[in-house]
Every structure is written in C-alpha cells, then in structure tokens.
Amino acid sequence: MSMKISEKKFNDRVGDGIQDSFMRGAVSSAQTRLYTNRLKAADELGNWEEWRELGEQIRQHTLENLDYYLMQLSENVSKRGGHVYFAKTKEDAAKYIQDVAKKKQAKKVVKSKSMVTEEISMNHALEEIGCEVLESDLGEYILQVDNDPPSHIIAPALHKNRTQIRDVFKEKLGYENSDDPYEMTKFVRKQLREKFMDAEIGVTGCNFAVANTGSLCLVTNEGNADLVMSIPKTQIAVMGMERMVPTMEELDVLVGLLCRSAVGQKLTSYVTVAGPIQEEEVDGPEEFHLVVVDNGRSQILGSEFRSILQCIRCAACVNVCPVYRHVGGHSYGSIYSGPIGAVLTPLLGGYDDYKELPYASSLCGACTEACPVKIPLHDLLLKHRQVIVEQEGRAPLAEKLAMKMFSMGASSAALYKMGSKMAPAAMSPFTSGNRVSKGVGPLKNWTDIREFPAPSKERFRDWYKNHKKGGDK
C-alpha cells in the first residue's frame, strides 16, 4: 500500500462515505467515546493548556534545531552498533529496506503499525523481491487479510464491525467460531505467534527518537511491537525525520500528551524505549537499522506549513472533525485522514491528486482546539486554499468566471445597479416564496441541502432613500 489508497475521484469517494450508514454510525460512536475519554484524561492531568503550551514549545524547538538533533541521533545510534540511513525520497527508503532484506536472504518480515512505512510503500517493495510481510497490529492485520485500506490514524479498522471481521476471517482464514472479540483475538494471536518465530526481519515505526541516547520510543496497546523488536534477528525502524525529541525529559511530556490525546489513557499498555542490543542485554536484534525518511519534509520545514511537522500522530483532530464524522476516512483518498490528512497529504502527495482536501473542512476550528501541540490546523487549511488559488491557479473554471463577473459588477456602479435591478426577475423561475428552491449551476449543491434567500425585490439603496432622515416612508 502507498499513501494513495483510492483511484476514485474525490466526489465519488465522499458519496460512498455518505451512503455507508454503518460506517457513519461507527465513526460517530468512536469519535464520541475517544473525545470523552480525552477530556477526562486531560482533566485528571490538570493545567491542560499549560501542558499543550509546553508540548508546542518542545516541538517548535526541536524543529528549529532539527539538523543538530538528527546528527546527534545518528551518532548515538552508530555508537551503540546500529546503522542509520537518511532517505531523501520514499523510493530511497524502500530501496534501502529491500537491500537489507536481500542481504539477509529474508523471506518473512513481520511489522508493527507504522504510517510512514505505508507512505513509502514498504510492503509492496518487499513483496516485489519475494518477501512475505505480516502486519502484527490487530487492526492492520484485519485490513491486510481483507485487502482494505486504513480509515483512521490510530484505529485503522474503525469502519468495520465485528460481524464483518468474523466474515473476513471465515472466508480468508477458515475461522469457524463466533464474532466474540475475545474469540477472534485469540484466533489471530495464534496465527501471529507462529509466524513471529519464523520471521527473519522485524520492522517498526517510531513514535519518537531520543537524540541524546540514540533510543527509539514505541507506544502500543497490544504489545506486538515488543515482539517485532525482540524476536527477529534483524530490526529495521522507519521514522519521519521530524519525529525527534532532544532528551528523555521531553519524551516524558510528549508521551503523556500523546496517550491522553489519542485514547484517553495516562499511558498505553506498552511504552517501549529501545535501540540496538547492548552486550549486557539478553534479547533484541543482532542487527539494527534506522531509516530516517525525508520524502518532502525538508521542503515543508522551510515553508509556511512548517508547523504541521509538530504533529505527534494522536488523531485528536480526527476525533473531533465533523467532516470526518460524515464522510469517513476513505473519502480522503490517503492513509492520512481527517484535518491532519487534509493539511499533510497535499504537501507530501501534491495538489494534482489532493487539491480538494483543504476544502473538506467547515473551518470550525475544533481540530486546532483539540491538538495537544497547538498546530493551527484550520489556519493551515486556509493557507492551502490561498496557495491553490493564488499561486497554483487551480480554482475551478466556474469559480474563476463567477469571481471575475462579481469583480466587474462590484467595481462598476452602473453594472452593479443594473445587476441588482435584474436579479429578482432573473431568479424568479427558481424561487418559491422568499427562498430559492432550485439552484442554478454552482448554487445547486447549496440549495439541494440548504435554504438560500431569494433576492429582495426592493434594493437596499431604494429602501435607504425612502427611509433616510426627512423621507416620507
């Protein structure tokens, strides 16, 4: 899988999402639960806004000094016996991982949940050279078995219910028991445990890399990442270049913010800080590789969208977004959905495929208020729209013509006067009472679901003339 998860056009994807009543119900229920849990966890911590401020300061400081911390990380990982590779593009990253697998003559690879490995199409790259890649995260495993893309950053199978999951297991894996979550989890665990022992390479993502220790931090609730890091003899960790913290002190703050914002917990079940195996340690990989992925991030770092790199992938913005609630994750056409996806995906994937995403927002600002590191998401969405129109010239033709006509009319007193006189008569065939009932052209999408007031028969300038001081009416 790559960052792009659908070849359908944006409107078709949105239409599919709106028509999927189960998905909408599941998303609504999950959003409510996760939102409520996040508020409760934040209240328990106390001084939440101060913690958000601290999180923002840590992320901004790290980005301002990213080159220094990346080199410090590289030096410390190397000192501990690991190998570090800086990948400029997603192709570079995938090629390096292929080369490691070829060198090890690996046939089986097991991996934990990682967005950046999806971004670089790692699974496809390994399958090209004959490797079997097994997802060990339960949600990702369900989707892998069903050949279905993720719909949420932290809950990838959110759009499926347990009956659908049972049917997938029955059809693809021969599962014969009920749709009880415990029974299905036990079945999957047995499947995965057997394959863990045979895997030559384990691949993980990285929630945060600690510069001054050369350590990686992984945050999970299933414990699968610990097995991926400890059983295979070779480990490959893949991280976006921005996922840095200077020291363990900053890690402590950000992990607390991440867990509370993502799932409403003080800590997840497993928070693992590890790296290359040391002489005194009894388990861990014999060989460790860290792949640091740029893939456009350095360009973002030097742009007006820089603050999006503060993201810690908690999905708090997704869990409060009213647009996501109604259309679901697949409508975004990317592994990154919700407000974070609407900002980040066009930066990584370009406007050709994703120019509609910045408009998939009501600009209510709920995402900005929810973000634990205070990314101004709705401002960045507006900035995208400005770039699309003013710099890229990608506004729809109808919109360009409409704005040109408005500009001509608004800048000419004679044209404006004539237009305001003609508007009521021109709109009368589409008017019922004092409302436009049937929109024309661009207005149709609006009037299909909203009321639109009909032009007043009495112009304001006429009303004012009749009611101004000294008037007769």
Swiss-Prot record:
Q: Which protein, by its recorded name, is this?
A: Lactate utilization protein B 2
The positions annotated for binding [4Fe-4S] cluster 1 are C311, C314, C317, C371
Instruction: Say yes or no: keyword Transport present.
Output: yes
Q: Where is the 4Fe-4S ferredoxin-type domain?
A: 302-332, 351-380
Instruction: Tell me a Gene Ontology molecular-function term this record carries.
Output: metal ion binding
> Superkingdom of this entry's organism?
Bacteria
Instruction: Give one Pfam family.
Output: LutB_C
Q: Which residues are involved in binding [4Fe-4S] cluster 2?
A: C321, C364, C367
UniProt keywords (A-Z) are:
4Fe-4S, Electron transport, Iron, Iron-sulfur, Metal-binding, Repeat, Transport
Matching entries from SUPFAM superfamilies are given as: alpha-helical ferredoxin, NagB/RpiA/CoA transferase-like
Q: Name one GO biological process term.
A: lactate metabolic process
The answer to keyword DNA repair applying to this record is no
Describe the family membership recorded for this protein in Swiss-Prot or TrEMBL.
Answer: Belongs to the LutB/YkgF family.
Cited function: Is involved in L-lactate degradation and allows cells to grow with lactate as the sole carbon source. Has probably a role as an electron transporter during oxidation of L-lactate.
